[in-house]
Amino acid sequence: MEKVEELKKEIERLKKERNAIILAHNYQLPEVQDVADFVGDSLELARKATKVDADVIVFAGVDFMAETAKILNPDKIVLIPNKRATCAMANMLKVKHILEAKKKYPNAPVVLYVNSTAETKAYADVTVTSANAVDIIRKLDSDVIIFGPDKNLAHYVAKVTGKTIIPIPPEGHCYVHKKFTIEDVERAKKLHPNAKLMVHPECNPEVQEHADIIVSTGGMIRRACEWDEWVVFTEREMVYRLSKLYPNKKFYPAKEDAVCVGMKAITLQHVYESLRDMKYEVTVPEEIAEKARKAIERMLEMS
């Protein structure tokens, strides 16, 4: 405990010295969330990244999030505390998948989940997050949409909007959300009969069908006030975030082992060393950044 408190003090000192800000995703370890200047979902973090006046952004999240921050802040130093903080789903989508889909559906816009690499974002007409995917896709003047890389979010968007969504790659998924099953739903209802189920749209369709609400992590925070007990179908650390914001409500993880290894690759020690040694700096080639920036900025304009 003493070491944790000591690290927190050193991080605060270094933040002032470097004129740095720490942005953290909702899935980060509790102690990392505690030292962050801002904690949020992908959309909230992207918006925050456009309003940062610090010289240095330390991004406690996975690599595609840090890339997005760099794309939106080309003149700032963006650091990711651990290079192993990566997103398996983002890495499933390759440029070839986009080009193949465009051959089949030349008039369909390419909509990419922000959980994608900078390289693939350069081929997108617009990016989306789980918080704004439905609204943005509704606004697009096309009934056929090429969408990647999460097939479960694609399923949810298709169901809500009535549009034809072409998922690329066909089996793109988040391994954490894919873990949730009907058995987990049944167990949750048995263990917590008075609780409602909040489900992330990256979960499997059969789990979505039993949800009381299907929302992004930001949506979970906004709507948690509607009921006193919730079973949370997303990454485990979201329960910490919700419990901190709503101490008088009860939140239960649907699965204790719903853990994103990429998110957990960043510890308090990594954040401290990142600020101390100014590592690891995120770079995005300008020709990729310029194209990807248009897709991200269009998302922010349409949100």
Swiss-Prot record:
EC numbers: 2.5.1.72
Binding site for [4Fe-4S] cluster: C87, C174, C260
InterPro entries: NadA, NadA_sf, Quinolinate_synth_type2
Keyword terms: 4Fe-4S, Cytoplasm, Iron, Iron-sulfur, Metal-binding, Pyridine nucleotide biosynthesis, Transferase
Enzyme class name: transferase
Any one cellular-component term (Gene Ontology): cytoplasm
Binding-site positions, iminosuccinate: H25, S42, Y113, V114, N115, S130, H200, P201, E202, T217
Pathway(s): Cofactor biosynthesis; NAD(+) biosynthesis; quinolinate from iminoaspartate: step 1/1
Cofactor remark: Binds 1 [4Fe-4S] cluster per subunit.
Co-factor requirement: [4Fe-4S] cluster
Assembly: Homodimer.
Annotated protein name in UniProt: Quinolinate synthase
Biological classification of the source: Archaea, Methanobacteriati, Methanobacteriota, Thermococci, Thermococcales
